[in-house]
Amino acid sequence: MPQLDVDKTIEELRLGEKIDLVSGIDFWHTASVPRLNIPSLRMSDGPNGVRGTRFFNGVPAACFPCATALGATWDTELLHKVGHLMGEEAIAKGAHVILGPTINTQRSPLGGRGFESFAEDGVLAGHLAGYCSKGIQEKGVAACLKHFVCNDQEHERLAVDSIVTDRATREIYLLPFQIAMRICKTATVMTAYNKINGTHVSENKKYITDILRKEWGWDGLVMSDWFGTYSCTSESIIAGLDIEMPGKTRWRGDALAHAVSSNKVHEFVLDERVRNVLNLVNYVEPLGIPENAEEKVLNRPEDQALLRRAAAESIVLLKNEDNILPFNKEKSIAVIGPNAKIAAYCGGGSASLDAYYTITPFEGVSAQSKGEVHFAQGSYSYKDLPLIGHLLKTDDGKTGFKFRVYDEPASSSNRELLHELHLVSSQGFLMDYRHPKIKSYLYYVDMEGYFTPEESGVYDFGVVVVGTGKLLVDDEVVVDNTKNQRLGSAFFGNGTVEEKGSKELMAGQKYKITFQFGTAPTSDIDTRGVVIFGPGGFRFGAARRQTQEELISKAVEVASKADQVVVFAGLTSEWETEGYDRPDMDLPPGSDELISKILEVKPNAAIVIQSGTPVTMPWAPKAKALLQAWFGGNECGNGIADVLYGNVNPSGKLPLTFPVRLQDNPSYLNFRSERGRVLYGEDIYVGYRYYEKAQLPPLFPFGHGLSYTTFTREKLELNTSPEKDKLQDGEPITARVTVTNTGKVAGAETVQLWVVPPPTEVNRPVRELKGFAKVHLEPGESKDVEIVVEKKLATSWWDEKREAWASEKGVYWVQVTGTGEGVLTAEFEVKKTRFWTGL
């Protein structure tokens, strides 16, 4: 299809067609105008993989490590390659736009979507997002930076008013967007759900038009977050929101037609919104993706290798006393813990997807160990009972269960079977499930499979629904979640609290499991303040009841007999998810006790934590070997095993500060919405800026990470260009330092460049990260590393009186740090205070 002549097309469009173009037609597609050859475009989540068009029963995809994991690599070259693969995955899914990267700032360790963003620091987050976006767009696919801006919590996210100073907005929350845009001007940007200082961002001219378009010179398409449009006329259209997502429209359509006819919205303003839609069509047109393209899979060996590399390079070696790691492959090993035999490969919400495959830590370790491998559960990490679908069999012997859709409930004697599927996962979000015979969101589903337990005992069963549900064992109701329902956190905050029941089962006996589900309209639960996604969703699980004491006792016994021990603990997509902020930083119940007991009998045990954001570690002082392994994507288990056994030398550095306790974090008194507002009381002191200013030592600082080798840094040279009368864009500060691998194994070092400001008119952080570079070195090898930063970006703070950046005169110190102790310093001078705006 040829490129559109945008001006001519706008002239030829009828008013109704223009209005159609500025809102989606369904969950993932824009409108088409066939008579003018304007195609429909497809969008897809998301930040750590391209899901395609279906949450429910979708086509599998590559799952990348979560953003904080990628942030821990501090590797722009790797993120560039990740972006390339994301672009190729999008093309395979027939998607023109990837809804990512996410670059909100983790002002609290509790944010439900904290794992979706790269770092607490705008320089690190912005560079990684920029290179990831560049990789995506070099494949012809449009990237989408989100959520613009201050969408930093899930609590009351549609309504909360973020009260934040302009200085903090500029220096902390807008900075990653600004830096990413300097590297790659993404084709699209998504607005945040929240308000800033009284106005929703999706109708906030200051941010969409004045800053993004005028000051930064960006000319792409602005879309709303899903159901994040709150107005029709002057508020969103005039503010610069180009397209409302998803469809069908709530705020445009007939309401917008009336607004144009009454001059509430001038047609030339609508034309500007349409222009940006058509420009996006032209941007992705060379892809040649047909409308309603078939969704395909890639899963190539080279893709698997990249995912494995990313998983391994993201792992942060927090402690390694007595050089306990790497382990010896010839020795026996005990693999213990709640995360050992599950693949905690991604967080929850719009970042979740059905991966091509997953590798658990136990599988990864077992594949590499040449000695005996033993396992003990130790404790469980589930929030709700673990899914049971993969343990069921159909009546014809297939793994999974039958999913039968009816027009009437099970109590009806003459109901019609509308559709039948075979499923394996006992969790389903039906918002994008469609079938020609299903005419509304009201229908009923019977799910049926057979369970044969391996062990006798009391089994607990649990049901979570957006709708209503009953679980039956051999036709006996064990769980009834149809009455007196309580709203919980699952399914973006739409789901009920898990209702439970129990039944004693005998090993080897086959039991029929039936789950009767009614969609969302069958429930009378109060869902004010949350968005209901169509027909709702379901989740049912089960587990044999065991006491924590029994589990730990068995784990201690197994650990005591092995040469080497590794404990896998942490969180999962149940604990870290969109729609829900964590109430605390704690590991799931039982995990801390398990780790402490194992360390008592095996002080040399290695502890591996999987989480997207910080957790408390009361046992950390006793642990000699400790790794942070994040949510590692498809290859999480292999990546962890590669580091444990020394196939890969760990090179990750923390992109987040890990506080000793929740009360230490700077947002502790001001997180969550109170009376519809959240006060960003810590101002610019987010993350390390606060801990260093307050002289409050964290458990592990931002930028920390050890290696199996050692490095030296020396010969710091600092060069600056002669100052002009006017501070020039691109005027550089170039730092050169020699890095040497002084150890016995190859490794990678991240050189971090910090700038310490002189005394200035305003209170400033002790120092701020301004640049970084990663270098790979063989044993004994030296390389000169060069980091170039612009002087104006290295020295400026936001002056609210002048509404401009201020590069204040004075002597600034550069600090260069990396693995281990030692700081190299140098200085440069800014001789004249200057003010500037722009990108």
Swiss-Prot record:
Catalytic residues, chain numbering: 225
Which PANTHER family does the protein's record reference? BETA-GLUCOSIDASE, BETA-GLUCOSIDASE-RELATED
Signal sequence segment:
none
Please name the Gene3D superfamilies in this protein's record: Galactose-binding domain-like, Glycoside hydrolase family 3 C-terminal domain, Glycoside hydrolase, family 3, N-terminal domain, Immunoglobulins
**Source taxonomy lineage?**
Eukaryota, Fungi, Dikarya, Ascomycota, Pezizomycotina
Xref: InterPro entries: Cellulose_deg_GH3 (IPR050288), Fn3-like (IPR026891), Glyco_hydro_3_AS (IPR019800), Glyco_hydro_3_C (IPR002772), Glyco_hydro_3_C_sf (IPR036881), Glyco_hydro_3_N (IPR001764), Glyco_hydro_3_N_sf (IPR036962), Glycoside_hydrolase_SF (IPR017853)
Q: Which family does it belong to?
A: Belongs to the glycosyl hydrolase 3 family.
The record's Gene Ontology cellular component field reads:
extracellular region
EC number(s) from the headed UniProt entry: 3.2.1.21
Q: What is this protein called?
A: Probable beta-glucosidase I
